Swiss-Prot record:
Gene Ontology CC terms, in alphabetical order: mitochondrial matrix
Organism: Penicillium rubens (strain ATCC 28089 / DSM 1075 / NRRL 1951 / Wisconsin 54-1255) (Penicillium chrysogenum)
Composition bias, Basic and acidic residues: 35-48
UniProt keywords, alphabetically: Chaperone, Mitochondrion
Superkingdom of origin: Eukaryota
Record's subunit section: Interacts with the flavoprotein subunit within the SDH catalytic dimer.
Lineage start: Eukaryota, Fungi, Dikarya, Ascomycota, Pezizomycotina
General remark: This protein may be expected to contain an N-terminal transit peptide but none has been predicted.
Name of the protein described by the UniProt record: Succinate dehydrogenase assembly factor 2, mitochondrial
């Protein structure tokens, strides 16, 4: 290296850390860099607000089955209170729920149940003064009833219920007697997600203590490596909370058959199927072919089912 270059490097000043920070700061704006010291604290109003929020009790848990439009819900003025203002409007408020023990179960015993409301029937909603009565058929022939129930089992509107009820109807609908058909007809008037969870979830007493008390996002799918099958990235990433079966379906023969159908078809989803030595069933697969019900036998066809009677 030549002597002039060496002298130039020695004479060049070394930039300090403060000048480097200032120079980098000037690349993005004209505001000078201000380092935090002991005097840089929040204003008294901010500290008072933080202390007020920290001393408040947690907001009450309100399940999705509790309506906020009823008269017993807390109001702020003339309107219902938003969820984040419940503890401010009434710290002692306890929401009412038609399912006994649901709030205590979801909160892990942190919150007691409020006033017990009667279970909602089919077509009933909280906060309304009328009831949406299901459509009843009178004088319907047996083959026509089976064809209609098959259509209602296949056209639910969500994929889970479509697969569950269409495969169930393919196996059991042709074998049901008249009383079972009437019960299945009433069962199909229930909410789709309720039917799905009633059929696929075990009661909390029959499964492990790790059953979630509320809908939770898990990390199991990250630890177990790649998954195979449809929607592989979502397997094990979500566990739904337990939905209790209402008293009107506690001893239902149709619901028992539907649960048995899930156990026979389940590969890994049902808790009891995981312990099967045979490895469980092969899953629901696809929607089966349409059955055409005649008076004495069943014919399988591949064409689209026409509505015989609604």
């Amino acid at each position: 290296m030549s002597a002039p270059r060496i002298l130039h490097r020695v004479a060049r000043p070394v930039p300090s850390s403060i000048s480097t920070i200032t120079r980098l700061n000037r690349q993005f704006g004209t505001t000078a860099l201000r380092l935090k010291d002991g005097s840089d604290e929040a204003s008294p109003e901010v500290k008072a607000h933080r202390a007020n929020q920290a001393n408040k009790a947690p907001n009450q848990f309100v399940p999705n089955t509790t309506s906020t439009m009823t008269k017993d819900f807390v109001n702020v003025g003339q309107k219902p209170a938003p969820p984040e203002m419940l503890n401010s409007a009434n710290p002692n408020y306890r929401p009412s729920d038609p399912y006994p023990g649901r709030i205590e179960h979801f909160t892990g015993g942190r919150q007691d149940n409020g006033a017990q409301k009667p279970e909602l029937g089919v077509g009933e909603m909280e906060g309304i003064t009328f009831k949406v009565e299901p459509l009843k058929r009178v004088g319907e022939e047996l083959a026509t009833k089976r064809a209609r129930l098959l259509y209602q089992s296949r056209k639910r509107g969500i994929l889970e219920s479509d697969l569950l009820l269409s495969t169930f109807a393919d196996v059991y609908l042709g074998k049901m007697n008249y009383d079972q058909l009437v019960e299945y007809d009433s069962f199909l008037d229930e909410n789709d997600w309720d039917i799905y969870y009633w059929a696929t979830q075990d009661s909390p007493e029959e499964i492990s203590p790790s059953t979630p008390k509320e809908d939770t996002i898990t990390e199991t799918w990250k630890e177990s490596g790649a998954k195979s099958g449809e929607w592989a990235q979502t397997i094990g990433a979500f566990r739904a909370a337990y939905r209790p079966v209402p008293s009107r379906w506690q001893n239902s023969e149709v619901l028992a058959l539907l649960r048995e159908h899930v156990r026979d078809k389940s590969a890994t989803g049902f808790e009891k199927a995981k312990n099967k030595k045979t490895g469980g069933g092969g899953g629901l697969g696809r929607m089966p072919d349409v059955q055409v019900f005649n008076s004495g036998h069943i014919v399988h066809r591949r064409h689209v089912l026409r509505m015989l009677y609604i």
